[in-house]
């Protein structure tokens, strides 16, 4: 029998597969089989949106075509029969034409590293196919499933808003106030200079959107769907069989034959279990276009929805119904809609089915508690006939008598209409407001006797608080017949707490927070129902106390918008001179079309191998044995490399590559498996058997390291003035400490490399995503015992780095190169997201202890500080992080008597490393926490204490470097003015007085960010410029393009210096072959240093060619180049910059480590929900001193992207470790970086007028890192809001808020009767699920 063919279309091209592997996902099929590499791998679990494509399906019954976005990483190709797939390549390209969304996202500066851009483009494209003029709500909803680590989202929204109606407006007009009016939050801006600069792009130049020019749905697929009789398709793979029934009868027969086989529609539940949990299903049943599974019908008893409907379709259906029917009939539907709007991203909602969501019964399911309290029923079918069962707590607990039978199929769900005097509410709390699994969720329903007030039925279910969804049915039963009033509230809360219990060591942790949410939700339910009763019967229903009403309102929610005040080019500047102009990232269009090539986009090399790692499952253990036999016996496995193979090459400097006798962290590299495919390598890695013997001590936290004196090297120390004497003369002394959690880099492109032996003289080429090609060259040369001139490292671009692609990348590259050299074959190594997060480490967790002596007016005269960073198991950059922390801890303040000491702690965690800001975001937060506490003690605002202690005019730092603080004062004054500080502070006070359960807070933070490497040698740079005879130029330099736009700026430099159009200048990438002996790209100086080298090369060429140019001033570069060639004058030049003068003597505690300082200030206003811990950033103003901006568009992108990354660090990004040292948060489903829902509603960025700095490139300043710290303005604004909540509740005295300020910490700091009501567990009496490190 001939195998059944799989037929679908990709970008209008027919695809026919005869031998389909059911385990093949669409993403690898597109990338490897079809070589469409524009669709990116970001996480593999549907959490980041990098792999978004559009699927189009034709329904022959309705004659309609449905377009929707999906995650290609979770889409089996077997599910695509009869569909049309559109990828980013299908929209347009640079060779033919661009689609308007591709053009606009690039020209609106919505790309930086560009790795997320194709996914963003496809999400927006799918929206435009359905809604050519979308609303802003539709826009933000469409992009809710896409993550970006670089831009801060705002320019992406700007690009997409150009498709909306009235795209120039924020669409948030309220009380007559709009973003286009120069009034903000009702407070008029009074200053003349607050008028914003012209936009960084011109909408008038954009291509129009013409829906008639889109790809048509393939007519062949329409004909097949309408004319060919449907029949079950079966695809057989090596391990898995895929069955696609096309009628309900065939589906029932398949389920009868294979009762244990899962029925999948979107693969969003089964897929992650298969990929991440190792679940195996030999048979998969996937229904295709079965009409009964898509039924939508209304009857007297309610609404019936087919189990095969996607969650997005359910959302649209319910939204339509609630608009048409009275509220009393649609209580359950409104509650479901509330959760559907935040559940996952658009891609997952379009893939996941209603039936799959119900049957999977995840403990944190958002819909199941609501469906259960709404008395929904499930319509089942099997060979034995139809059956109807309630969607009850017993069903959700999988009780056999209430569950589906293995051979039964869920056909549809009946959702009853609600009745008069019936109220249904939905609650959830997550780490992030959208596209995040709930920490706790709940569905609650109450029915009153006629007339209201007395409970007739009550149902309360919770998710996230147990191994299954839990019902408080006993509590509900005891409350039936009782009146609904506030007097009973405490009784209800205690009853529920007694019934819905959580063990102190419960999975997921956050136990006290979850207990508090259980009763906080119950309180909100009481308020919502009371409000509903009052609407029904104003005279006889309980009235809400005025201070309770705020608990019912959502947090501040408007559409995001921004204003920019950037530097404008001097009118006298030549029009062709690009310096200072907002020029688009020169790879922006290629990012948007998918044509930009990243490391793993490179075509496979002949006989290429794939390498993957086996990592330790223990944090500190002796390796007793390693059994490789079973793994080596698997087909396709070529070799397994251990430390024994590397021998003395297993170390380089302080780093060891593969474990020898011991492992020192979970994620320690044990061995490397090499096979002929990625799949086979990963299968073999699972078969490597390692036996461990645990060792003591196990040190995970900073406190444990201090206890065991486990430090790298000795302390670092700086001191100025006489601290001990100053403490004797101050009015007050306080001591405190703050813990700052670590942060994952979460670059969108994971660690990637391809090593290709050249087959001659031992030469080897390394194509790698790194910030430091020279270091990889050195480490590989040492490993292979080659001279460096035979090892060439090439980097075209990097899909995000932030400091995370230096040390560990080099180790991975050395091992991969060893494998390639040993076997004489190319070897590719691409880490999966979970592997990357487990192995690589991130920002150092930090502990700051401070003792401050100050006068009553707030002036700090003495400060004694101790800093500790959690370095992990190897030194890496930990000592440098401590050094930078100590040098920069003063931030914007003059402390006349300061002693600071720091230690890098050795622990059994993966080695932590550099991350944007490099110690300053942690050290600065310690200082600002101290300032804030001093303010509280003095009864002053933190802004007053900051002003009193701020550097003024020309001053010296605690390490005796002189600088001028004039720009710092300007930034502070301008920020205070632009944010209307005093007016808004008063408005916040009024808001807080009127709202008991919502509070607002505001904070203004100054910034003095030193820029420099600390060493002349580490600051040197080189460049190479060629001029060709056609008048074009090629430039090479040592900097790495990782999203910051350094290549664009270098071409701007060449254009200015050679007076050559930018279109005539090209830059291919970075290579140790063209520019040797480069330094790492980082520290905000990449454009500074390399730009000065490029400038030097250009000036050398100009000087050399000056006689020729002067003789023919009207000539072109083609003329001048030809003349030079004819005269045997070289048209190539090397440029060099030796580095800024930089030094620091740690023995003397003085030096000049930094070339200059970036100054700035940020004001943020937030709103918090005291019951749940949610927060919303309402508005942020940022003022920066940038010198002379080389490219305002790129510089604003750096400031804004860094701010959002810093905001994530200080609020929602939380690493979670087990007490045994295992990292739990290994992907976007567990680790939450900011998404579109998290950005400030208003963002106002201003640059000071240009200022001169003679030593830097065109008086510019590096802005890559400084903005991260300004994110702490959100942290301290939340602190201010929490303080207001505590003061209202009469809670005095100090309290400690550590970073990140997650919903858990916010909620638990807002102490109230509910936090006092929950049971508390004695520390030390239990083993927690997770620990802070």
UniProtKB/Swiss-Prot annotation:
GO MF annotation: an example: protein homodimerization activity
Enzyme Commission code(s) on record: 1.2.3.1, 1.17.3.-
Catalysis performed (reactions): an aldehyde + O2 + H2O = a carboxylate + H2O2 + H(+); retinal + O2 + H2O = retinoate + H2O2 + H(+)
Result, substituting residue 168 to G: In strain: C57BL/6 X CBA and 129/Sv
Positions with a binding annotation for [2Fe-2S] cluster 1: 43, 48, 51, 73
Outcome of swapping residue 1329 to W: In strain: C57BL/6 X CBA and 129/Sv
Cofactor note: Binds 2 [2Fe-2S] clusters per subunit. Binds 1 FAD per subunit.
Modified residues (Phosphoserine): 1063
Cofactor(s) required for function per UniProt: [2Fe-2S] cluster; FAD; Mo-molybdopterin
Outcome after substituting residue 1265 to Q: Abolishes catalytic activity
Protein keywords: 2Fe-2S, Cytoplasm, FAD, Flavoprotein, Iron, Iron-sulfur, Lipid metabolism, Metal-binding, Molybdenum, Oxidoreductase, Phosphoprotein
Domain 2Fe-2S ferredoxin-type stretches: 4-91
SUPFAM superfamilies on file: 2Fe-2S ferredoxin-like (SSF54292), CO dehydrogenase flavoprotein C-terminal domain-like (SSF55447), CO dehydrogenase ISP C-domain like (SSF47741), CO dehydrogenase molybdoprotein N-domain-like (SSF54665), FAD-binding/transporter-associated domain-like (SSF56176), Molybdenum cofactor-binding domain (SSF56003)
Pfam family name, one: Fer2_2
Binding site residues for [2Fe-2S] cluster 2: 113, 116, 148, 150
Record localization: Cytoplasm
Keyword Plastid: no
Induction pattern: Repressed by pioglitazone, fenofibrate and PPARA agonists. Induced by testosterone.
Family: Belongs to the xanthine dehydrogenase family.
Note: AOX genes evolved from a xanthine oxidoreductase ancestral precursor via a series of gene duplication and suppression/deletion events. Different animal species contain a different complement of AOX genes encoding an equivalent number of AOX isoenzymes. In mammals, the two extremes are represented by certain rodents such as mice and rats, which are endowed with 4 AOX genes, and by humans, whose genome is characterized by a single active gene.
Functional note: Oxidase with broad substrate specificity, oxidizing aromatic azaheterocycles, such as N1-methylnicotinamide, N-methylphthalazinium and phthalazine, as well as aldehydes, such as benzaldehyde, retinal, pyridoxal, and vanillin. Plays a role in the metabolism of xenobiotics and drugs containing aromatic azaheterocyclic substituents. Participates in the bioactivation of prodrugs such as famciclovir, catalyzing the oxidation step from 6-deoxypenciclovir to penciclovir, which is a potent antiviral agent.
Entries under NCBIfam families matching the protein: mam_aldehyde_ox (TIGR02969)
Protein name in UniProt: Aldehyde oxidase 1
């Amino acid at each position: 029998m001939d195998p059944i063919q799989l037929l679908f279309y990709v970008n209008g091209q027919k695809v026919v597969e005869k031998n389909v592997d059911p385990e093949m996902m669409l993403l690898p099929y597109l990338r490897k089989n079809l070589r469409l590499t524009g669709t990116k791998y970001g996480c593999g679990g549907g959490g980041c949106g990098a792999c978004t494509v559009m699927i189009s399906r034709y329904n022959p019954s309705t004659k309609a075509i449905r377009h929707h976005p999906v995650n290609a990483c979770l889409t089996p190709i077997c599910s695509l029969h009869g569909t049309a797939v559109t990828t980013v390549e299908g929209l347009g390209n640079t060779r033919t034409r661009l689609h308007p969304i591709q053009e606009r996202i690039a020209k609106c500066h919505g790309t930086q590293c560009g790795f997320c851009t194709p996914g963003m483009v496809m999400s927006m494209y799918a929206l435009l196919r359905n809604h050519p003029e979308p609303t802003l709500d539709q826009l933000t909803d469409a992009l809710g499933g896409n993550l970006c680590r670089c831009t801060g989202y705002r320019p992406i929204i700007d690009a997409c808003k150009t498709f909306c109606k009235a795209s120039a407006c924020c669409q948030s007009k309220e009380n007559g106030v709009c973003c286009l009016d120069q009034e903000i939050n009702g407070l008029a801006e009074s200053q003349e200079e607050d008028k914003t600069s012209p936009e960084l792009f011109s909408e008038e130049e954009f291509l129009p959107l013409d829906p008639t020019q889109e790809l048509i749905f393939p007519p062949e697929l329409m004909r097949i769907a309408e004319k060919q009789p449907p029949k079950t398709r079966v695809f057989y793979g090596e391990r898995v069989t895929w069955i696609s029934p096309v009628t309900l009868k065939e589906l029932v027969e398949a389920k009868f034959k294979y009762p244990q086989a899962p029925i999948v529609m979107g693969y969003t539940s089964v897929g992650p279990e298969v990929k991440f949990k190792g679940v195996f299903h030999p048979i998969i049943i996937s229904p295709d276009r079965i009409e009964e599974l898509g039924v939508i019908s209304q009857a007297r008893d309610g609404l019936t929805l087919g189990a095969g409907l996607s969650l997005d379709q359910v959302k649209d259906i319910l939204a339509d119904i609630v608009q048409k029917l009275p509220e009393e009939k649609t209580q359950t539907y409104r509650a479901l809609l509330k959760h559907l709007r935040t559940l996952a991203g658009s891609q997952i909602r379009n893939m996941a089915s209603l039936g799959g969501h119900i049957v999977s019964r995840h403990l944190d399911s958002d819909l199941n508690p609501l469906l259960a309290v709404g008395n929904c029923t499930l319509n089942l079918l099997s060979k034995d006939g139809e059956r109807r069962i309630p969607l009850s707590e017993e069903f959700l607990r999988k009780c056999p008598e209430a569950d589906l039978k293995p051979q039964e199929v869920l056909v549809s769900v009946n959702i009853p209409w609600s009745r008069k005097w019936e109220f249904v509410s939905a609650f959830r709390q997550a780490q992030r407001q959208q596209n995040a699994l709930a920490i706790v969720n709940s569905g609650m329903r109450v029915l009153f006797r006629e007339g209201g007030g007395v409970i007739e039925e009550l149902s309360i279910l919770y998710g996230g608080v147990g191994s299954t969804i839990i019902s408080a049915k006993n509590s509900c039963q005891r409350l039936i017949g009782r009146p609904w009033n506030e007097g009973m509230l405490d009784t209800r809360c205690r009853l529920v707490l007694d019934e819905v219990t959580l063990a102190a060591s419960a999975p997921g942790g956050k136990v006290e927070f979850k207990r508090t949410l259980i009763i906080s939700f119950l309180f909100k339910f009481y308020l919502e129902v009371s409000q509903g009763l009052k609407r029904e019967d104003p005279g006889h229903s309980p009235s809400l106390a005025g201070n309770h009403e705020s608990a019912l309102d959502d947090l501040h929610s408007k559409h995001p918008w921004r204003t920019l005040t950037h530097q404008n080019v001097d009118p006298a500047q030549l029009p062709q001179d690009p310096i200072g102009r907002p020029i688009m990232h020169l790879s922006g269009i290629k990012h948007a079309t998918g044509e930009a090539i990243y490391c793993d986009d490179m075509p496979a090399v002949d006989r290429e191998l794939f390498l993957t790692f086996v990592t330790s499952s223990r944090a500190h253990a002796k390796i007793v044995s390693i059994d490789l036999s079973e793994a080596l016996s698997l087909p396709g496995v070529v070799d397994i490399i251990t430390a024994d193979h590397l021998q003395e090459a297993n170390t380089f400097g302080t780093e060891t590559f593969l474990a020898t006798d011991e492992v020192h962290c979970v994620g320690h590299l044990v061995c490397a498996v090499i096979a002929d495919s990625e799949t086979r390598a990963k299968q073999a890695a699972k078969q490597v058997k390692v036996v461990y013997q645990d060792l003591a001590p196990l040190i995970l936290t900073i406190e444990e390291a201090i206890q065991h004196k486990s430090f790298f090297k000795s302390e670092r120390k700086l001191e100025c003035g006489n601290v001990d004497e100053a403490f004797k003369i101050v009015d007050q002394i306080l001591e405190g400490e703050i813990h700052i959690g670590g942060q994952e880099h979460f670059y969108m492109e994971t660690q990637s490399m391809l090593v290709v032996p050249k087959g001659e003289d031992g030469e080897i080429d390394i194509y790698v995503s790194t910030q430091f090609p020279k270091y990889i060259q050195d480490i590989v040369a040492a490993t292979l015992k080659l001279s460096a001139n035979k090892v060439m490292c090439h980097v075209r671009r990097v899909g995000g780095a932030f400091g995370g692609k230096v040390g560990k990348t080099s180790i991975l590259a050395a091992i991969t190169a060893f494998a390639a050299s040993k076997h004489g074959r190319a070897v590719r190594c691409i880490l999966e997201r979970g592997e990357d997060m487990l192995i690589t480490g991130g920002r150092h967790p930090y502990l700051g202890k401070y003792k401050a002596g100050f006068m009553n007016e707030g002036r700090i005269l003495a400060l004694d500080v101790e800093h500790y960073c959690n370095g992990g198991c190897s030194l890496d950059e930990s000592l440098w992080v401590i050094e930078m922390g100590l040098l920069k801890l003063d931030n914007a303040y003059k402390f006349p008597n300061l002693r600071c000491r720091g230690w890098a702690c050795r622990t059994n965690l993966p080695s932590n490393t550099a991350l944007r800001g490099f110690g300053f975001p942690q050290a600065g937060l310690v200082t600002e926490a101290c300032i804030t506490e001093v303010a509280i003690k003095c009864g002053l605002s933190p802004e007053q204490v900051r002003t009193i202690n701020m550097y003024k005019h020309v001053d010296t730092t605690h390490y005796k470097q002189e600088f001028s603080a004039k720009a710092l004062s300007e930034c502070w004054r301008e920020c205070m003015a632009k944010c209307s500080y005093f007016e808004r502070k008063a408005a916040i006070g009024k808001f807080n007085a009127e709202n008991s359960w919502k509070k607002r807070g505001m904070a203004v933070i100054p910034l003095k960010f030193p820029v420099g490497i600390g060493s002349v040698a580490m600051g040197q740079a080189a460049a190479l410029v060629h001029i060709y005879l056609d008048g074009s130029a090629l430039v090479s330099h040592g900097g790495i393009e990782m999203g910051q736009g350094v290549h664009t700026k270098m071409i701007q430099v060449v254009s200015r210096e050679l007076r050559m159009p930018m279109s005539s200048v090209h830059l291919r990438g970075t290579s140790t072959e063209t520019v040797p002996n480069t330094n790492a790209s980082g520290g905000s100086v990449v454009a500074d240093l390399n730009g000065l080298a490029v400038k030097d090369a250009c000036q050398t060429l100009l000087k050399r060619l000056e006689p020729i140019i002067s003789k023919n001033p009207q000539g072109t570069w083609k003329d001048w180049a030809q003349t030079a060639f004819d005269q045997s004058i070289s048209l190539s030049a090397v440029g060099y910059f030796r580095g800024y003068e930089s030094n620091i003597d740690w023995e003397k505690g003085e030096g000049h480590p930094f070339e200059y300082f970036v100054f700035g200030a940020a004001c943020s206003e937030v709103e918090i929900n005291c019951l749940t811990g949610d927060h919303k950033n309402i508005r942020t103003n940022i003022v920066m001193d940038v010198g002379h901006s080389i490219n305002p568009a790129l510089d604003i992108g750096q400031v804004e992207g860094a701010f959002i990354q810093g905001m994530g660090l200080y609020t929602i990004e939380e690493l979670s470790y087990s007490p045994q040292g295992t990292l739990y948060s290994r992907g976007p489903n567990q680790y939450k970086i900011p998404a579109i829902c998290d950005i400030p509603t208003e963002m106002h960025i201003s640059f000071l007028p240009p200022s001169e700095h003679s030593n830097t490139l065109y008086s510019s300043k590096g802005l890559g890192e400084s903005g991260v710290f300004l994110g702490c303005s959100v942290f301290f604004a939340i602190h201010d809001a929490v303080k207001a909540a505590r003061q209202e509740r009469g809670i005095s005295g100090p309290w400690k808020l550590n970073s990140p300020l997650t919903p858990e910490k916010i909620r638990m700091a807002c102490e109230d009767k509910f936090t006092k009501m929950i049971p508390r567990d004695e520390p030390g009496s239990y083993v927690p699920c997770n620990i802070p490190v």
